[in-house]
Each structure stands twice: as structure tokens, then as C-alpha cells.
Amino acid sequence: MLLAAGEGKRLGTPKALVELGGRRLVDRGADLLRDGGTAPVVVVTGAAPVTVPDVVLVPNPDWRTGMGSSLAAGLQALPGDCAAAVIALVDQPLIGAGVVRRLVAAHHAGAELVVAAYHGRARNPVLLARRHWAGVIAAADGDTGARPYLRAHPGLVTLVECADIGSPDDVDTPEDLARVAALLAG
């Protein structure tokens, strides 16, 4: 699931629509999940109408309240046969499909709450096994997303180191966008 509902105040435009290397961040994020082996790919939208091929679009009418409402909307829209959900953010274009594959592999090995780590620091994306969705939805508030639930269940969280294959750098400002574009250009 890709959370892509925000308006991007500091960036001056909805992040989902921002182009990086000739591609919108929302398309990059959908490809990240698809190439990482997740299906269906759900994109939660809000501030800007977005069309993305081959995804399930979930509009969040409460997007102004923050990431928590988008997370809840997306989890509630997933089909009943989904055993887990990988949650990624639209503004982290340096996370590659290999990160998603590592989270999925940890889940297949028995982990239920899987968090990508970069140099030991927990960041996004995260994988949430279905049995935790109701608790995550209940705890999600404002821009905290799944963080309160994960902090309340530290013994169930599996950190998966991903610094060798990705970076959680956010695109929040025009300066961030320029820096990330330079990194992608090599």
C-alpha cells in the first residue's frame, strides 16, 4: 500500500504528482510495491486526484487529518485474502524493490510486524500482518501512522537492515527534491 494523500505544503504541490527523473512519485511508489512482489497494489489518494495504471485507488476524504486516516482507509480497503500489507510512503523514492522483498521474506519466515531499518534506525516501509490491522487502525492518529502500535508491541517487531539497498530520505522540500534527483542521476 502506498500512502500518497498529502498536499505537500513545504514542497508546494501534492507529492504524488511531483516528477523525478521524468516519472511521478506516485508511479515510482506503485512500481516499488509491484516490483517488490506485493499484490494488489493499493494507492491511497487525497489532496490531488491521481490515476495510476494497474492499482487499486482508495480515496481518503479525511486526508487533511494526516497519515493515520490514510493508513486506516488503505488497510480497510484491502481484500480479505491479504495476509499482510507493506506500507510505503510516496515521498521516499530512494527505497528500492529489494527493501520490500526483504520485508516480505521476513514475513514468510514468521515475522508479523516488520520494519525496514537503515543503520539500525527504524523507518519505512513497514509490513503489518493482518491480525494487527485493527490495532494499527485504532492507534493511528494524525501523522503517526503505525508508529504508536509498533512502539506498544516491541517484542513483535522485527527490524530488517536495508541501508545497503535503499535510503529512507524524504522529499519534503524543493531542496530535498533537488538532492534526491542528483543522487538518482548518479
Name these PLM-found stretches.
Residues 9-13, 136, 167-168:
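A short acidic, helix-capping loop that chelates divalent metal ions and anchors anionic groups
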Residues 92, 124-127, 138, 168-169:
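A residue-level structural signature of the nucleotidyltransferase/glycosyltransferase Rossmann-like core
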Residues 94, 99, 132-135, 176:
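Short, well-ordered alpha-helical scaffold segment located
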Residues 82, 123-135, 174:
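Conserved nucleotide-sugar donor-binding
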Residues 8, 18, 133-134, 178:
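Nucleotide phosphate-binding site architecture
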Residues 138-186:
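Conserved alpha/beta core of the MobA/IspD/sugar-nucleotide pyrophosphorylase nucleotidyltransferase superfamily
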Residues 1-122, 155-162:
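Nucleotide and nucleotide-moiety/phosphate-recognizing core
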Residues 72-74, 133-136:
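Short beta-strand and adjoining strand-loop segment in the mid-core
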